[in-house]
């Protein structure tokens, strides 16, 4: 066959050898603490989460524990919703790790906040659509979006439709992935590339974290 020039106008190009011939760099890091550190976690920022695992979610608690372990305080929690499973957050509120919240708050965390007034600013309660609009408009800016996915590949293509912890589509996080400074995918099922039914695209993702289980898919307190 004919030799193809790979250098043109002082630029070097890689010849096309087929759709799956070139290796892709993995974005998998050791754990959520490593991902947060590399993403530039610092005091005063806004980490965001979705609530699709509802009262079975493990990702929010795991991530905020990592925030605490890194010695970071004064964060604004920008989740779509909290449930009884997030009761451990009460201690982080008391310790000043979480000082502001924007999003729906249910169950024991809501009871604690409404009766004890422990935050330095009033909670801003947002409907799911209202939160989407706030992120899109810039009124609420997620510095680091932490997105639970039931399956993802090493490049960050992710879905909630496959895997042992499948919970349905990742309905409330695409807007976070589009606008956040850094995006972390947290999954308990790493798939081959490309992840089927991807809802979050690899070009938006900075880090991928694999944990043993992202949550329990249960129905109680499962209001969307």
Regions found by a protein language model. Give the residues of each.
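Conserved alpha/beta enzyme-core scaffold
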Residues: 1-224
